[in-house]
């Protein structure tokens, strides 16, 4: 998911906090490994910034590639079922890790918290479903580029509801994100219409129809993702969730919703199941579905690991830089069209991610260096929320 959809997966699993108390029970602390007489010291690996960054990048790329592989079959139409299997595998993995003592800060299931969190889970279903549909119709590079538009919607949502602000450098990065999306769409449409050197044909019309469906799903995903992130931010402060609690409730509460949606809206006839799971690729597809569930754990682990041994600043820059290999993976593994337009769009999107990460770093540094002697400017709705909280 996802991102994949790796961005979707991170938002699905983690609440964005990175306090050591929430990460350390799962990731070894520096010096925690035993220093015996053996030549190999595990702490050299667990405390290596380079290895943690590489692991995070590989986990993100593998998640995106796996999701694209699973949903890109010519007859695939069981997206709800696929996402349900992901959540089931993730929950099983969390329970096993807890029983093995790898996760020690997962609180027992609370029915009251589940009821409060359930609306957020419904928004999550909308986010991950539209994400897989967009990935099904669009190439990985185009999907990755358009995913940046979510950042813009979330940023202005924070301005409206949480009193956030948009700096000039962030605004410049938003312009680059929009430009990269326009260039990517133009390159995609040009390749669909004239990629074979011919003029408009039935095949070109079908390809254009597929792209239009992908853009429609991508647009819905942008707003579903923003709604999920902003709503989660508003509710999570009341829940006192730790990172693994967020992952557990998100995946557990979506399981019944996804299965019900699958049984109601998807075709479960034997003929359709055979089309979705053809004999020649059935085993690989099942393995991919299982791995995609485990990959949500891997990405969450690698995210916390990367933040622990580097810094949140480095992690944000790695996330921006990671856009490039994810987009390139689509060119390598799925034969996405390599044209001047597509390469230019990838490059512009890559630069926009770096500029945005740099803008956020500067904004955070300026906040930390200025004493809060005045009341910050905020929107009316944000002020009313703050006044209500004080009441």
From Swiss-Prot:
Signal peptide: none annotated. Glycans are attached at residues 267, 272. GO terms for biological process: GDP-mannose transmembrane transport. It is a multi-pass membrane protein. Its main location: Golgi. It is found in: Golgi apparatus membrane; Cytoplasmic vesicle membrane; Endoplasmic reticulum membrane. The chain crosses the membrane at residues 45-65, 76-96, 116-138, 142-164, 171-193, 210-230, 246-266, 285-305, 314-336, 340-359. Residues 1-11 have a biased composition (Basic and acidic residues). Keywords: Cytoplasmic vesicle, Endoplasmic reticulum, Glycoprotein, Golgi apparatus, Membrane, Sugar transport, Transmembrane, Transmembrane helix, Transport. GO terms for molecular function: antiporter activity; GDP-mannose transmembrane transporter activity. SUPFAM superfamilies: Multidrug resistance efflux transporter EmrE. Residues 1-44, 97-115, 165-170, 231-245, 306-313, 360-391 are cytoplasmic. Residues 66-75, 139-141, 194-209, 267-284, 337-339 are lumenal. GO terms for cellular component: cytoplasmic vesicle membrane; endoplasmic reticulum membrane; Golgi apparatus; Golgi membrane. Belongs to the TPT transporter family. SLC35D subfamily. Homooligomer. NCBIfam families: nst (TIGR00803). This is GDP-mannose transporter. The lineage of its organism: Eukaryota, Fungi, Dikarya, Ascomycota, Pezizomycotina.
């Amino acid at each position: 998911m996802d991102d994949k959809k790796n961005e979707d997966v991170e938002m699905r699993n983690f609440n964005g906090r990175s306090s050591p108390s929430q990460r350390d029970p799962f990731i070894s602390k520096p010096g925690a490994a035993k220093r015996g007489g053996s030549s190999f010291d595990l702490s050299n690996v667990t405390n290596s910034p380079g290895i943690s960054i590489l692991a995070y990048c590989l986990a993100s790329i593998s998640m995106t590639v796996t999701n694209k592989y699973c949903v890109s079959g010519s007859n695939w139409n069981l997206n709800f079922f696929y996402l349900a299997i992901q959540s089931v595998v993730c929950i099983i993995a969390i329970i096993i890790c807890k029983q093995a003592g790898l996760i020690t800060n997962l609180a027992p299931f609370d029915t009251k918290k589940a009821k409060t969190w359930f609306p957020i889970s419904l928004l999550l279903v909308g986010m991950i479903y539209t994400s897989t549909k967009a990935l099904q119709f669009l190439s990985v590079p185009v999907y990755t580029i358009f995913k940046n538009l979510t950042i813009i919607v979330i940023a202005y949502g924070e301005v409206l509801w949480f009193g956030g602000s948009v700096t000039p450098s962030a605004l410049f990065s938003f312009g680059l994100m929009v430009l990269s999306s326009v260039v990517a769409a133009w390159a995609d449409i040009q390749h669909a219409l004239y990629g074979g050197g011919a003029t408009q044909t039935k095949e070109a019309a079908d390809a254009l129809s597929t792209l239009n469906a992908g853009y429609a799903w991508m647009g819905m995903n942008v707003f579903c993702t923003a709604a999920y992130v902003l709503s989660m931010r508003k509710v999570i402060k009341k829940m006192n969730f730790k990172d693994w609690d967020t992952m557990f409730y998100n995946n557990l509460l979506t399981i019944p919703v996804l299965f019900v949606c699958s049984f109601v809206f998807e075709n479960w006839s034997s003929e359709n199941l055979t089309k979705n799971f053809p004999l020649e690729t059935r085993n690989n597809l099942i393995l991919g579905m299982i791995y995609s569930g485990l990959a949500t754990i891997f990405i969450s682990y690698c995210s916390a690991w990367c933040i622990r041994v580097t810094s949140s600043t480095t992690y944000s820059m790695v996330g921006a830089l990671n856009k490039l290999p994810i987009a390139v993976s689509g060119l390598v593994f799925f034969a996405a069209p390599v044209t001047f337009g597509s390469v230019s769009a990838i490059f512009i999107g890559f630069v926009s991610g770096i500029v945005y990460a740099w803008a956020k770093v500067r904004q955070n540094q300026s906040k930390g260096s200025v004493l809060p002697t005045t009341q910050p400017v905020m929107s009316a709705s944000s002020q009313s929320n703050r006044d209500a909280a004080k009441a």
